[in-house]
């Protein structure tokens, strides 16, 4: 089983996170940010990731620090759980519909951190969640995980639906990328011989 546990404590947040890449989609999430809990639960379910997150953050200020630091913790756990990436597919993609919303998500577990984020979110908030924080979450994840991630909105008007499609697509793309490649068992999927 490919798994990792990360603890991250700063003056702003205290996070305990456990991740299993070979899971069933079980999520036990309490971040103090309700909408983020919902999105991470969707990512775990659609990625078949077992994910546990506990976060005590300075949400009396706003949700920024918790959202960003959870992205860092999840990215760190993801990188650790993957190990040397031997035998994985490396690439994953999904075009995911959520009612009128349609979002493309593509990942490369290259070891190089890059985020291309093209979501046009009309609402500044969903519930109490500042929608601009979704980009901060994905940016923090890509930096910590060493992952290239493209998120592109192809259609949609409802901000909740667009974000839901993005997080579900993210889970599905990760699931595909971390899956074993039966044609390359034991091989590192790079002509360089490493993915760092």
Question: Where would I find each of the regions flagged by the language model?
Answer:
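Structural preference for solvent-exposed beta-strand-turn elements
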Residues: 1-196
């Amino acid at each position: 089983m490919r798994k990792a546990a990360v603890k991250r404590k700063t003056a702003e947040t205290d996070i305990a996170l456990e991740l299993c890449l070979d899971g069933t989609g079980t999520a036990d999430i309490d971040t103090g940010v309700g909408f983020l809990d919902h999105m991470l639960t969707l990512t775990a379910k659609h990625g078949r990731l077992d994910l546990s997150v506990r976060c005590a953050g300075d949400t009396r200020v706003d949700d920024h620090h918790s959202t960003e630091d959870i992205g860092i913790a999840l990215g760190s756990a993801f990188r650790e759980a993957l190990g040397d990436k031997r035998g994985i597919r490396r690439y994953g993609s999904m075009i995911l519909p959520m009612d009128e919303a349609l979002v493309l998500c593509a990942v490369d577990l290259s070891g190089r951190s890059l985020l291309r984020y093209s979501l046009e979110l009309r609402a500044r908030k969903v519930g109490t969640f500042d929608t601009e924080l979704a980009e901060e979450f994905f940016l923090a994840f890509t930096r910590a995980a060493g992952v290239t991630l493209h998120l592109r909105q192809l259609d949609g008007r409802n901000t909740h639906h667009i974000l839901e499609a993005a997080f579900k697509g993210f889970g599905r793309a990760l699931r595909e990328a971390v899956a074993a490649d039966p044609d390359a068992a034991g091989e590192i999927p790079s002509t360089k011989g490493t993915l760092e």
